[in-house]
């Protein structure tokens, strides 16, 4: 087992091969990485089967689905890498240029961060997405997978390194930490001087531990306590379609809705229809039904579990939905601001004034009007695959693409000027 410190030192020795690579060199590397991912799919699937077998009975079915790979998902991972080839390289872009009265020309230029560390849980696609995004933005990357997905991550990294071996960029620019204990995570949090940025991707516990303990700069990819508010002026058919998609299309992801707020004026008509699409119809179709956790007012109209206060502060990542009735748009916004993780929140309404109020008052990274929150995704936003969804405000917010993984420096050109 290679020590975490040895990995830090190794990546420091080779980072210049990617930090200074040309766009053409990086794009060639991405193409070779995508090819090797497909060539190695049998090895990746075999490794994934080991992880799946070990995880069964220890994690939920929804989390098992996150871990699971098949040929279609591997093909999607390879396609995600290839999509980055067509995106503009941020490194080297001149953001601003100013000529001062003394003749100095000051340019603000995008540069790579250097070395990015990623701590993540049981998401195999994060391994390929993170490596590809880091490389296209000129960065080396140190990956630390969760224990549940380690064998899969190792097989993926092995394939990606084979791709890099066909190029001028050192394969050692992608590193996978073999130690999945807390000690390696702590080492990455304290790797000042070795990591220029640390990004945690996972549950609330992981993210909180990194934010509270890291001495390395961190971008917080927050959990998703995602709300949909159905206004009294909503198109109810539209609202039901949005809710069904936001809750059931993939409940294990951070942009899935967890809390539904409904204006009490439409509760009598709307809630029975909600129960029909999320419970009755799904049961008849032998699909997983949604457990509705209802506040006291909602329980007067439909059946379900009694909501506890903590249900409105929980990222379920499962077929569970907390439901609350509100008396006004203002109450809905107040609830969201009190309980949201500022990831993604939506309003369904045909009232333009209500929509404008909601988008101005809700302080989240992505605020939707009449659309599913499932669109909060780098690919859906046209950014290619993403490094995560930032819920903080400094440096990056929302889906993090290539530009968010770069910094900038000032280049000052003179003709012999001295300061007087």
From Swiss-Prot:
Function: Catalyzes the NADPH-dependent reduction of L-glutamate 5-phosphate into L-glutamate 5-semialdehyde and phosphate. The product spontaneously undergoes cyclization to form 1-pyrroline-5-carboxylate.
Family: Belongs to the gamma-glutamyl phosphate reductase family.
GO cellular component: cytoplasm
UniProt keyword Protein biosynthesis present: no
Any one biological process term the GO annotation gives: L-proline biosynthetic process
Catalytic activity: L-glutamate 5-semialdehyde + phosphate + NADP(+) = L-glutamyl 5-phosphate + NADPH + H(+)
Top enzyme class: oxidoreductase
Protein's UniProt keywords contain Cytoplasm: yes
This enzyme's EC code(s): 1.2.1.41
Gene encoding the protein: proA
Organism placement in taxonomy: Bacteria, Bacillati, Bacillota, Bacilli, Lactobacillales
Pfam families reported in the protein's UniProt record: Aldedh
Protein name: Gamma-glutamyl phosphate reductase
Keywords: Amino-acid biosynthesis, Cytoplasm, NADP, Oxidoreductase, Proline biosynthesis
Subcellular location(s) of the protein: Cytoplasm
Pathway(s): Amino-acid biosynthesis; L-proline biosynthesis; L-glutamate 5-semialdehyde from L-glutamate: step 2/2
GO MF annotation: an example: glutamate-5-semialdehyde dehydrogenase activity
Gene3D superfamilies: Aldehyde Dehydrogenase, Chain A, domain 1, Aldehyde Dehydrogenase, Chain A, domain 2
């Amino acid at each position: 087992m290679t020590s975490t410190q040895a990995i830090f030192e190794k990546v420091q020795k080779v980072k210049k091969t990617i930090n200074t690579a040309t766009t053409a060199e990086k794009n060639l590397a991405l193409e070779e990485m995508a090819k090797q991912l497909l060539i190695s799919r049998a090895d990746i699937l075999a490794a994934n089967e080991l992880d799946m077998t070990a995880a069964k009975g220890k994690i939920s079915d929804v989390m098992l689905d996150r871990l699971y790979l098949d040929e279609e998902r591997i093909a999607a991972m390879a396609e995600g890498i290839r999509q980055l080839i067509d995106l503009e390289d941020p490194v080297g872009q001149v953001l601003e240029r100013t000529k001062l009265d003394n003749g100095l020309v000051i340019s603000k230029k995008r540069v790579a961060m250097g070395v990015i560390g990623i701590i993540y849980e049981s998401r195999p696609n994060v391994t390929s997405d993170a490596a590809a995004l880091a490389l296209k933005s000129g960065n080396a990357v140190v990956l630390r997978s969760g224990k549940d997905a380690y064998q899969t991550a190792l097989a993926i990294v092995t394939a990606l390194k084979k791709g890099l071996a066909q190029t001028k960029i050192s394969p050692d620019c992608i590193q996978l930490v073999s130690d999945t204990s807390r000690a390696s995570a702590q080492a990455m949090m304290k790797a000042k001087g070795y990591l220029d940025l640390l990004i945690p991707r996972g549950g609330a516990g992981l993210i909180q531990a990194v934010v509270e303990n890291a001495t390395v700069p961190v971008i917080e990819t927050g959990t998703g306590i995602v709300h949909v508010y159905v206004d009294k002026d909503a198109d109810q058919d539209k609202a039901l379609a949005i809710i069904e998609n936001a809750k059931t299309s993939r409940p294990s992801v951070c942009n899935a809705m967890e809390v539904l707020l409904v204006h009490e004026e439409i509760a009598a008509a709307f809630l029975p229809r909600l129960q029909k699409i999320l419970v009755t119809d799904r049961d008849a179709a032998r699909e997983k039904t949604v457990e509705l956790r209802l506040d006291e007012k909602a329980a007067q109209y439909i059946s379900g579990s009694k909501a506890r206060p903590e249900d409105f502060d929980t990222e379920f990542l499962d077929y569970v939905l907390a439901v609350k009735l509100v008396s006004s748009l203002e109450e809905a916004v107040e609830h969201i601001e009190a309980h949201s993780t500022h990831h993604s929140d939506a309003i369904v309404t045909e009232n333009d004034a209500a929509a404008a109020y909601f988008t101005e008052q809700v302080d989240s990274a992505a605020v939707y009007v009449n659309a599913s929150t499932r669109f909060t995704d780098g690919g859906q936003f046209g950014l290619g695959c993403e490094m995560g969804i930032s819920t903080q405000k400094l440096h990056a917010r929302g889906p993090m693409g290539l530009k968010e993984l770069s910094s900038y420096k000032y280049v000052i050109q003179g003709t012999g000027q001295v300061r007087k």
